[in-house]
């Protein structure tokens, strides 16, 4: 029988929560396969069927999620996210295509600077998303990181993981900005995540000066694990290895915001990709449970 969304984890008291959930059902920044606007609804609905435990049987009931509902108008995303950040919780955003990260990362930058922190982006994706224009727009999902840099993020505090699909303008930009760390999927599939974690830990572990925004595009996973996405790229990342990488980030780094983007239920097969996103969230909740004790 269908239960309430997120079962026992949901609370109507935002002060009681340790996690705030925001849906952004927007996909007008998408260049090809659409449908990501349906992901927040689909993932919430699937959560009704998922007991509050990790894959290892660890209870998640120490977490309380406050659902801030959806904001679907692009022009209203900034104001809505400003409201949420004032509560000083962990923030989980369900997109939407990757263009939704442009306004949320802008607000996060302003938030971090008010706290005298240096804002950091860890970008897990098949694509660098560092085009200046794409399809005639500066607000395409292919332009997310370029807009972040324009808004004030330092290039040496952006790390890209899982990349394997480049536009020519992105290759040119990155060749001129070697301080921006890029880890291709081919490197990871050969060498694993060890050196990436070492680099990130050296820069940000135990740091009181940084605050991290983790942006997870589901197309970082190989399409065999995540077929329901608008711009699938072959030769991607293994879902277990990527999950373990994300878990290590949450265990060791000061992550304040995570978005999960580019899940497209209409392009999916038996909700495989939506389930992957949801199960990833639950594994992260297992780590947040320990931090919330």
Please give the residue ranges for each predicted region.
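Conserved alpha-helical scaffold segments that buttress catalytic/binding sites
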Residues: 2-293
């Amino acid at each position: 029988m269908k239960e309430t969304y997120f079962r026992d984890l949901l609370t109507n008291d935002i002060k009681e929560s340790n996690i705030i959930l925001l849906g952004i059902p927007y996909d007008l920044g998408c260049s090809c396969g659409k449908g990501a606007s349906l992901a927040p609804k689909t993932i919430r609905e699937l959560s009704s069927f998922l007991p509050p435990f990790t894959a290892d049987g660890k209870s998640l009931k120490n977490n309380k999620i406050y659902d801030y509902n959806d904001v679907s108008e692009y022009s209203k995303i900034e104001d809505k996210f400003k409201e949420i950040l004032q509560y000083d919780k962990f923030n989980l955003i369900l997109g939407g295509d990757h263009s939704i990260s442009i306004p949320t990362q802008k607000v996060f930058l302003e938030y971090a600077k008010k706290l005298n922190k240096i804002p950091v982006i860890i970008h897990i994706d098949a694509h660098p998303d560092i085009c200046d224009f794409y399809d005639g727009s500066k607000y395409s999902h292919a332009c997310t990181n370029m807009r972040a840099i324009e808004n004030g993020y330092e290039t040496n505090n952006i790390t890209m993981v899982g990349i394997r699909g480049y536009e020519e303008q992105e290759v040119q930009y990155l060749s001129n900005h070697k301080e921006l760390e890029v880890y291709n999927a081919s490197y990871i599939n050969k060498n694993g995540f060890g050196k990436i974690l070492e680099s990130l830990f050296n820069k940000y572990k135990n740091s009181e000066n940084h605050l991290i925004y983790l942006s997870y595009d589901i197309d970082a996973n190989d399409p065999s694990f995540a077929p329901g996405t608008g711009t699938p790229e072959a030769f991607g990342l293994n879902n277990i290895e990527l999950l373990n990488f994300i878990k290590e980030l949450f265990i060791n780094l000061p992550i304040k915001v995570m978005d999960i983007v580019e899940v497209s239920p209409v392009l999916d097969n038996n909700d495989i990709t939506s389930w992957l996103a949801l199960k990833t969230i639950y594994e992260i909740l297992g780590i947040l449970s320990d931090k919330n004790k």
